[in-house]
């Protein structure tokens, strides 16, 4: 009699365990490919005597394709006419631009912990006096880390419309932080 009761208890415990596993598996969201957004911060050097800072929100879609909504600040320094080298005034006050834009990043190759995207987009902004538009093209390589973090590097080329520069090209490195 005791054997039958313990057998029934084990049967119900096994049933409860299986039910709990099924509920857990269906109710808890997965994190492998969740298409959540990332905050992206990157900085780099551009030819000729330029520095770039980009802060962006990246929304990843299927197969590592992504949309990027970004704000960009560019600083171009020059040598000081009076002292002959780069001083704080010639560094910070020479030529500055800012812009807001959108870029589409189709994935061209994927690996185990990395993926590569083309970066195609446009932006609109201003320097100190005029409206400045730009067309962006480039290549981005991202490496996945733990907890959804990524590090990346970009080779970027910008065609400037209405600014002092016509072309800007350079390398940017940065980090992508997951937004939950």
Residue map of PLM features:
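Cleavable N-terminal export/targeting peptides
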Residues: 1-36, 179-180
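Short amphipathic alpha-helical "recognition" segments used for binding
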Residues: 6-9, 13, 19-20, 56, ...
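Short glycine/proline- and aromatic-enriched beta-strand/turn motifs that initiate or cap beta-hairpins
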Residues: 30-77, 170, 176-180
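Solvent-exposed loop/turn segments connecting transmembrane beta-strands
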Residues: 41-54, 92-96, 123-135, 159-168
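Gram-negative (and chloroplast) outer-membrane scaffold detector with strong preference
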Residues: 58-151, 177-180
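Internal, hydrophobic beta-strand segments that form the core of beta-sheet-rich folds
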Residues: 154-155
């Amino acid at each position: 009699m005791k054997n039958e009761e313990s057998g029934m208890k084990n049967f119900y415990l096994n049933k409860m365990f299986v039910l709990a596993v099924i509920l857990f598996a269906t109710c808890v969201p997965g994190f492998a490919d969740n298409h959540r957004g990332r905050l992206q911060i990157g900085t780099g050097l551009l030819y000729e005597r330029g520095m770039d800072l980009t802060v962006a929100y990246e929304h990843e879609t299927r197969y590592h394709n992504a949309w990027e909504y970004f704000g960009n600040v560019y600083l171009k320094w020059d040598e000081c006419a009076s002292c002959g080298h780069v001083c704080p005034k010639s560094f910070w006050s020479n030529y500055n631009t800012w812009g807001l834009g959108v870029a589409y990043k189709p994935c061209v190759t994927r690996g185990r912990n990395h993926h590569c995207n083309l970066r195609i987009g446009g932006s609109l902004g201003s320097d100190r006096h005029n409206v400045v538009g730009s067309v962006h093209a480039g290549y981005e390589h991202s490496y996945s880390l733990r907890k959804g973090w990524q590090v990346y590097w970009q080779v970027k080329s910008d065609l400037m419309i209405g600014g002092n520069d016509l072309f800007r090209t350079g390398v940017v490195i940065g980090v992508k932080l997951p937004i939950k």
